[in-house]
Amino acid sequence: MTKMEQVYGGSLYDLAKEEGLTEQIYSELQQVIAIFDGAPDYWRFLQTLSIAKDERCKALDEALGGRVQPYLLNFLKILCENGTMGGLKGCAQEYRRRYNEDHDIVEVRATTAVEMNPQLQEALKAKLQTLLGKTVELTFKVDASCMGGVLLELPGKQMDGTVKHRLESVAAALKNAAV
């Protein structure tokens, strides 16, 4: 994430917080990104600096005017006018980071060798919420190279309980013992 994305995303969050709109803008920001992801030609158009700023901002007005919070629309226009629309996802990341921080939410990614059944997913989420004392947003990834167990990735921390990690630890210990 660039410094510009941190500053812009943080500024949008500060404004939303001041106006009591953090949840609405968070939701709409995610929806706008999903729309742009689903319309790559439109997304490229908004980022094309050879197209006049007024034309790109007008396209934003036509597509989103009255459908999203005016502060969010103005934020998107500022990105468009400054030629920094490509940083929207980074701005959204910073907004989400600040939102999560203020709402005691922690994002955790769990990687397993096979897909976890829904009961195990809920049990893991409940256990993490108890341990961390925060609301947990848990995402899951399947990676057969884990061989078993679970790898948990939290902000600034990784807890590796995979079979692959254990085998690597045993191999390293054997290698050091043989020397």
PLM feature segments, named:
Residues 1-179:
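Elongated, mostly alpha-helical coiled-coil "stalk/stator" tethers of large membrane protein machines
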